[in-house]
């Protein structure tokens, strides 16, 4: 996505966090898109990692930062989208993410099998931040653009994936994401893999 933007300013991690904090305070509407990738290459490990709410020390928490703060700011209009990379494993991973976000953060989750390539945040349709991660998933920094054309492009991409998520969820059977339901899925998964 970065190569589609006309003009960006590179920010290191500290600059990115400072920028986010100041922009968030000034914003009435923030849209967060999170491109969730299995950085380890191991689907089962990632599923269990999210299911038991153990995020380890991976600095992939920028969207969570917003969600945590948004819960304290009921006037904020937040929309967010989680990407699920492989269709064949989408159902279980979607359920784990639903439990993580809905039960613990009070937010609904959308999941889509489309790939946006980037995590990004849009502030009031006037600025966009793209997040820059290492291959292991650590947050390095980001790119900021306030050009109207850039913001519109990213907003259009966001809307495209949001619609994709809505269409996708219509095809996925829904199940209440309770702790018991999630534990049952984990046990089923472990049994199928002969894990203890």
PLM feature segments, named:
Residues 1-86:
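PLD-like (HKD) phosphodiesterase/transphosphatidyltransferase domain
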Residues 24-25, 99, 169-170:
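Contiguous, function-dense segments enriched for cysteine-driven chemistry
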Residues 31-36, 79-82, 110-112, 121-123, ...:
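A structural signal for short, well-ordered beta-strand segments and their strand-loop junctions
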Residues 41-44, 87-91, 129-131, 137-138:
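Short catalytic/ligand-binding loop motif for oxyanion handling, primarily in non-cytosolic enzymes
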Residues 42-47, 89-93, 117-122, 182:
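Short, solvent-exposed polar/charged micro-motifs at secondary-structure junctions
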Residues 134-196:
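Signature of lipid phosphatidyltransferase scaffolds
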